[in-house]
Amino acid sequence: MQFHLSGFHPGDPRIHNPQARVVAPPIKRPLPSHCDVVIVGCSPAGLNLAAQLSQFRDIHTVITDLKDDRLTVGQADGMACRTLEMFQAYGFAEQVIQEAYGVNEVAFWKPDPSDLSHIARSSKIDDVEEDLSEMPHVIINQARIHDHFLNVMKHSAAETEPYYARKLIDLTVDHANEEYPVTLTFERAVTHSQFNREVETVRCKYAVGCDGARSQVRKSIGHELVGDALNQAWGVMDVLAVTDFPDIRLKTAIQST
């Protein structure tokens, strides 16, 4: 079933009334002074880990994020087959498949040899090789994946919910403290990402940085991002296209002249 006919709107698309889809804003509450695990960042990796740990009532997990609230518009949308297999373990793979667009084929276009001012389809292949997985490759807004993880967390044994509007200032490790060796210091926002000097401190056994490429966790422990960068210009657009391009609903690679 196609849910999003006129662009993406946050919330569960099975709820027809857009106003009813809106989730209540998070309750403002102080961070605990001590816990077992602190996850910095409500990224997909952070929410995945929080959802796993939330299944255990005796593990006190805290997850924080810089944003004021849950994600409403995502920054990515591709879900690989293996990712859906993981979602199946959480119990929401089928709902993702129902909401998502299935990528079944890849079409390749290149300049038409008979008229280089035009392009022509040169070939088509299956998007997923045979017997790779029982799950499909799909496209769905990242915000919906966050919603599903948050629902798993909220209804889990530990009833875990994120602490939003927290900016990590510092992380230190005291090896002499065997019970709670890690200390994290956060600055708390008062209104819409306007941070002041209201500081909160949490001591924990383990801290996990899921706060992206410019990770403050990584910086605090003295590490640097190791990897290569490509000197390539590229972009991503999220548009409602009015077009007569025949493969608009396929994953398509177009080679220009």
Regions found by a protein language model. Give the residues of each.
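Conserved SAM/SAH-binding loop
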Residues: 165-169, 189-190
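Active-site-adjacent segment of FAD-dependent monooxygenases/related oxidoreductases
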Residues: 4, 9, 72-155, 159, ...
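Conserved structural-core and active-site-/substrate-pathway-adjacent residues in large, well-folded domains
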Residues: 39-41, 50, 87, 146-149, ...
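Core beta-strand elements of the Rossmann-like FAD/NAD(P) dinucleotide-binding domain
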Residues: 33-35, 192-206, 210
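N-terminal Rossmann-fold NAD(P) dinucleotide-binding loop
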Residues: 46-47
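Glycine-rich FAD pyrophosphate-binding loop
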Residues: 51-77
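Extreme N-terminal leader/targeting segments of oxidoreductases
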Residues: 1-37, 52-59, 178-180
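Conserved FAD-binding catalytic core of PHBH/FMO-like flavoproteins
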Residues: 151, 206-257
